[in-house]
Amino acid sequence: SARMGYMILELNNIDKSFGEKEVLKGVSFTAEGGKAFGLLGRNGAGKTTSIRIIMNVFPASGGEVLLDGKPIDYNKIGLGYLPEERGLYPKKLVIDQLAYFAELKGMGAKEAVRAVDYWLNRLGMTEYRNKRLDTLSKGNQQKIQLITALAHNPHIVILDEPFSGLDPVNAMLLKDVVKEQISQGKIVLFSSHQMAYIEEFCDSIAILSAGRV
């Protein structure tokens, strides 16, 4: 039973095929706002495909994705995504990249810069504001990706292997940030092949294996 006012994301019986290859076979799970949901599975189990369907990158072949019982209106619902493949524009300045993405997600220019500066400060990254992305360490690039996912204050936050490549200090910081997002009532979905993180964080778990839960 969901708590009042929190959103519920449901995948009902999702199938996905690419040509002859069946990747997802009747995948169903429910993720609630204000809780962390973990999607656990080996590489190739269908985690990324499930995420891409939630994000509307491509449609499911069958089944439905619902938010509060209705199809998701992607113009109204903000999604934040930290991909496992960390893609950045190397020659851009940190502030330009981040403000660009926040504006892309519907923020006004001033609002975007304000939000980005808040997050740079929150993650101890203010000194890198006017640096080029390709001058940053891997861990700091990952923090930039996290800001890209969170600056526009999304309703649904999807974190794909968020702790891989982080040193202990940054891992702790990320954990704090994620707990904060959960306490704000957001739907936070973790995807990982590492049980330890999922167990530590998540209130409920779906284990994907060969395209099934």
PLM regions and their residue ranges:
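Conserved ABC ATPase "signature" region
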Residues: 99, 103, 110-128
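Conserved ABC transporter NBD signature motif
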Residues: 63-77
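Conserved ABC ATPase signature
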Residues: 132-136
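Catalytic Walker B motif of ABC-type/P-loop ATPase nucleotide-binding domains
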Residues: 157-160
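A short, surface-exposed alpha-helical micro-motif characterized by mixed small hydrophobic
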Residues: 198-200
